[in-house]
Amino acid sequence: MLKLFSAFRKNKIWDFNGGIHPPEMKTQSNGTPLRQVPLAQRFVIPLKQHIGAEGELCVSVGDKVLRGQPLTRGRGKMLPVHAPTSGTVTAIAPHSTAHPSALAELSVIIDADGEDCWIPRDGWADYRTRSREELIERIHQFGVAGLGGAGFPTGVKLQGGGDKIETLIINAAECEPYITADDRLMQDCAAQLVEGIRILAHILQPREILIGIEDNKPQAISMLRAVLADSNDISLRVIPTKYPSGGAKQLTYILTGKQVPHGGRSSDIGVLMQNVGTAYAVKRAVIDGEPITERVVTLTGEAIARPGNVWARLGTPVRHLLNDARFCPSADQMVIMGGPLMGFTLPWLDVPVVKITNCLLAPSANELGEPQEEQSCIRCSACADACPADLLPQQLYWFSKGQQHDKATTHNIADCIECGACAWVCPSNIPLVQYFRQEKAEIAAIRQEEKRAAEAKARFEARQARLEREKAARLERHKSAAVQPAAKDKDAIAAALARVKEKQAQATQPIVIKAGERPDNSAIIAAREARKAQARAKQAELQQTNDAATVADPRKTAVEAAIARAKARKLEQQQANAEPEEQVDPRKAAIEAAIARAKARKLEQQQANAEPEEQVDPRKAAVEAAIARAKARKLEQQQANAVPEEQVDPRKAAVEAAIARAKARKLEQQQTNAEPEEQVDPRKAAVAAAIARAQAKKAAQQKVVNED
């Protein structure tokens, strides 16, 4: 009974929810064998043809390359690309690639030499003697990636499976309309394909190997059954035709009844899936020693006069392939890379063929039908019924259109396989897949930005923590240094303490005066002088405080100073224009100048020490001060311009000038030390000073007249 149940379960086929049955349109291209396409003159090889980062360049402009020669190095998840033919590297520059927006990616441009020479090839026909790691590394370095459309590096996928893979599934469903690349490959290369499957099984050591193929490929089914006639380790499962049965999650459920968990991978349930084209590429890499330089591409559509499947070299321009298939474009011709449901329209035809290019569809106007205008959603739920991932496309549409990223994520938009079934059945002609692609791209960009922000925050916090640790370490070092001084510092501290103790001991000793000697009062005298100096400093401080309290009007002072300067300039000009016969006694002039300066200083000090209520006009004071200075300069100039016959003893003149300056200083000090109650009226003082200057001037003129 258990054996019967196991046999029943072994051949059981499950069915997934949703799905559609569009017109297959496969007979246009699957009836002719695979053929080679003549070499193009120029090849454009993008460095990134897979999921992951691009490899490191190992060629330069001007290098000669052979077919199969690595153009980049593959390290980690970086998959290398290889030269599709022999020729010369003419440029390494960005070039538009197979993308809906024709985004430019760094590419190696090779001009073919027409010889198509291979590099030396080293095949491993005895691959069973090689270790698992060696085989995975060879597959990776030979550039093998998933050829079913995802482009995930095969070596990385095999390495990630490890020892937990129980079921190896070979995806031969090829469910999308028009595409027949896998169908034709299975018809023409079934034996090589099975050999590649055995290499994968040798690496993974699964418990069972399943080939899932739709029942609309009878010739391919017959070829595989013929090759597997003597094999018991590989099971061929024929499944009903339904779109999208070729989806990874859908085919896994159809063949095993297991569902891949949300956000997980098929390896989490012990399943690993590979495409038939990938298995064939593994065989050529391991046994033949040939890196992946070409793949099968379907050329179909009513605008192509010679449809079929061809071996297309990677990097071949799409235009070259279409011209070889006798492309007859119409006025508004559209060319789709991929199928009609999951493919995208090419913006121009000079983009190159890459590893994930499986079909070039050039439909006519009759095939496409009239373009339908997008209308409002009528909430019919037809999209939800057709969704094979059990999602709610209607809700995802509203969330995507309203930029509600959180709600779209909550409704598992990441599980959308972009099969296009919802858009196919939508009566309002809403391009739902386009909305979902854009929403997923925006969510990915937001997460990438959040990741960068989190990394920046982590770096900032790490830096702050490091600075705090360094600061704490410095403080700890300073504390340690303060607590434990060095030997040199200890000696200095001990010497200072000894000196202090010695001084204290001397201070406590009694003063002894010997007979016949005078006591040493130098310390007492020095202390008394210090106290006097301190008292004088305090008195000066107090005087400065009192002076600051009595502030004159600064505007009046400035005006008086300006008037004084003007009068002084006038006197200097008069002195310069005076007649030579008016000679002045230089000694008397010097004495008078000193007296005038002393009076001027006395007047300024009296003005500064005046009470606040007795304000002096600063303009008058400044004018008088300037007049006094001008008279002093005039007398000094007269002394300098004296006639030679009236020579003056310089020593006497210097003595007299010094006496005059001393008297002036004495007068200033007396004014400064005057009692506060003996205040002088600044106006009276200014008048007296002016009278004194006038009398001095008159006396000087009278003396000159008498001498004449």
Swiss-Prot record:
Residues 369-397, 407-436 form the 4Fe-4S ferredoxin-type domain. It is found in: Cell inner membrane. The keyword Transcription does not apply. [4Fe-4S] cluster 2 binds at residues 387, 416, 419, 422. InterPro entries: 4Fe4S_Fe-S-bd (IPR017896), 4Fe4S_Fe_S_CS (IPR017900), Ion_transpt_RnfC/RsxC (IPR010208), Nuo51_FMN-bd (IPR011538), Nuo51_FMN-bd_sf (IPR037225), RnfC_N (IPR026902), Soluble_ligand-bd (IPR019554). Its cofactor is [4Fe-4S] cluster. Its EC number is 7.-.-.-. One of its GO terms (molecular function) is 4 iron, 4 sulfur cluster binding. Residues 663-684 are annotated as: Disordered. Pfam families: Complex1_51K, Fer4_7, RnfC_N, SLBB. GO terms for biological process: electron transport chain. It is an enzyme of class 7 (translocase). Binds 2 [4Fe-4S] clusters per subunit. GO terms for cellular component: plasma membrane. It is a peripheral membrane protein. Keywords: 4Fe-4S, Cell inner membrane, Cell membrane, Electron transport, Iron, Iron-sulfur, Membrane, Metal-binding, Repeat, Translocase, Transport. [4Fe-4S] cluster 1 binds at residues 377, 380, 383, 426. Part of a membrane-bound complex that couples electron transfer with translocation of ions across the membrane. Required to maintain the reduced state of SoxR. The complex is composed of six subunits: RsxA, RsxB, RsxC, RsxD, RsxE and RsxG. Belongs to the 4Fe4S bacterial-type ferredoxin family. RnfC subfamily. This is Ion-translocating oxidoreductase complex subunit C. The lineage of its organism: Bacteria, Pseudomonadati, Pseudomonadota, Gammaproteobacteria, Enterobacterales.
